[in-house]
């Protein structure tokens, strides 16, 4: 059959074009067999302006950080100096086995003013009598030692179970004394519930984070007895509404950066609710017009966070995103690759930048009863 095509092709220039295209398709198919989609990492041919920013326009308070190895505190301070970061809040002050005391002691030995620590309640004790009251007492003791806030990890409402085998909801009344105590002490609750929307949808050809979920199957919370993302967020919102005197900071843009319209509605509804941008510039930067309008409108309610160990190179990606109008920025160095897209800078006004970088955080942190 190939011989017939070649003979026929000699008689007609138009058919020579057809043969070339047919050969190209066949060649492409052969090459494609050697490249998996997960291995495909195309390099853009765009030539666009790149602004190099190593220092922010205003000093930074990173209110969402994880300091990791405590012996690296000196290195972290060096990275902070290099990146113009004045204060970092570590969210790793776990109350289990009183680990927060070690974290506090180490942090304060290097810099009491620059390395702050939040307290993470021990949900494993949920079945103990008077758990909430007792944990609230431990929190007050921790605040007297220097703890400046509370951190809620995503396991609450998602994987933590009590002795009945049921998942403990975020708005479980047993936890009310903890939220109330935060209000009394005037310390914030950094609350992370649920995860990206894609992690709660089927892992199929329509999932925009398929490659991540294929590499990390445990990141998927679709089905298998997990509550829906919507239900978890509703639980959190009921807590915020019930405890109006307590400040809640919604980690990762309130855990719904894919829908800033809804996040804006929450901010309108709950005056005690704030959000931070940590590890979500990949979501914000693919909707730059909407994100810019959001940041300007809610400039008094947005905080800066990175969600990583202090790293000057990672901070520079955040600064470039917030301060410039650069196009097609690779967000991966700011945290890790989240989705197969690049982002666009928001070029925020200086008065907005200063609030996001430090002023909003200062108001919250400086309100604490114990400092």
What does each model-found stretch correspond to?
Residues 18-29:
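Bacterial N-terminal signal peptides
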